[in-house]
Every structure is written in C-alpha cells, then in structure tokens.
C-alpha cells in the first residue's frame, strides 16, 4: 500500500498539490492522510499514524517547500510519530525496509535550486534523507514540481500525471 502523508497548511490555495493528490487517488491501494485536515489543532493521534505507517510499503511525504523545509505540522508529525523504540533505536524496527518518496512542490523554478546562489535539492533533502535512513527506510529519488505559482493548468496536469506514473512504476516493480 502507498501511504501519502500530505502536509499543506493552505490546501485550497494549491492547485499543484490538489492535482497530484487527484492523480495519486486514481491508483489502487493508495491512502492519503491530510495532516492539516486531520489535525487542525496540531494534536496528532500518534497511534493512528503509526498504524497507517505499519500498513504501508511506500510512504510519501508530500508538501510544499516552505523556507527550504517542511511545513510545521509535518515536522511535528515526524517528532511525535517517529518515536524511539518504534521507528528507531532499540526495538525500533517498524519502518525497516519500507520505501520513502519525498514529493515536494515549489514556487521557484528548477534552476533556483541548483548549487550556486541557492542550495540544491541534494542539500535540501539531506535532513529528510537522514531521518529516513535513521528509521531504516529506503530513500527514493525525490519527485519535485517547480514553478507551481506560475504554471498553467495544462503544465500542472502534465506534471501531476508524471507523479502518478512515478507511483505506478513503483507499484509495478514492487508488487508485480
């Protein structure tokens, strides 16, 4: 099962993420957990989140990039859900061997994230990749949609279809 942990503080403003979720939702065995919908008060049900993670083979962290990082509720989710003794540390093997895909949208163009005057995606992904590896997850190359503020609907739809194809390809390779 693919579990999408979706974290967008203003989901009604994001056409890109909406289209990504719509495309992913057409696939079989996909569960979408919208953190800002489930936990508007930031009071995370850790047991429910861990149960959802235990059912997944592929975990997707989908969100808009905010200040070169994750939205606050996703960071809190990581702090609360990925606990010692469950996700890491002595006895913390619940996530070992599962795959993790970082699916991120940005307002800036792809060239904005090349090494030079701005940090590149290899640098920006390091904290998430380190978290994944520490929890025994298999890190997959990230999926990113850029220029989402200025893209027309056709471009956004095409990129959202690429996201769906990425998930479908993972399903085909990992579950026949």
UniProtKB/Swiss-Prot annotation:
Reactions listed under catalytic activity: a quinone + NADH + H(+) = a quinol + NAD(+); a quinone + NADPH + H(+) = a quinol + NADP(+)
Enzyme class: oxidoreductase
This protein's name: Glutathione-regulated potassium-efflux system ancillary protein KefF
Role of this protein: Regulatory subunit of a potassium efflux system that confers protection against electrophiles. Required for full activity of KefC. Shows redox enzymatic activity, but this enzymatic activity is not required for activation of KefC.
InterPro entries from the UniProt entry: Flavodoxin_fold (IPR003680), Flavoprotein-like_sf (IPR029039), K_H_efflux_KefF (IPR023948), KefG/KefF (IPR046980)
Co-factor(s): FMN
Keyword match Manganese: no
Subunit structure: Homodimer. Interacts with KefC.
Source species: Salmonella dublin (strain CT_02021853)
Gene3D superfamilies assigned to the protein according to its UniProt record, in alphabetical order: 3.40.50.360
One GO BP annotation of this record: potassium ion transport
Record GO terms (molecular function): electron transfer activity; FMN binding; NADH:ubiquinone reductase (non-electrogenic) activity; NADPH dehydrogenase (quinone) activity
Taxon lineage: Bacteria, Pseudomonadati, Pseudomonadota, Gammaproteobacteria, Enterobacterales
């Amino acid at each position: 099962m693919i579990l999408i942990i979706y974290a967008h503080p203003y989901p009604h403003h994001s056409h890109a993420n909406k289209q990504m979720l719509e495309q992913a939702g057409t696939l079989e065995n996909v569960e979408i957990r919208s953190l800002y919908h489930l936990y508007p008060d930031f009071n995370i049900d850790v047991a429910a989140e861990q149960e959802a993670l235990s059912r997944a083979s592929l975990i997707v962290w989908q969100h808009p990039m905010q200040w070169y990082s994750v939205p606050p509720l996703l960071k809190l989710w990581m702090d609360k859900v990925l606990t010692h003794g469950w996700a890491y540390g002595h006895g913390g093997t619940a996530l070992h061997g599962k795959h993790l895909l970082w699916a991120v949208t940005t307002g800036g163009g792809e060239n904005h994230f090349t090494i030079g005057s701005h940090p590149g995606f290899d640098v920006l992904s390091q904290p998430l990749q380190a978290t994944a590896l520490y929890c025994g997850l298999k890190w997959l190359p990230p999926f990113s949609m850029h220029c989402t503020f200025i893209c027309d609907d056709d471009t956004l739809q095409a990129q959202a279809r690429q996201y769906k194809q990425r998930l479908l390809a993972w399903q085909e390779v990992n579950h026949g």
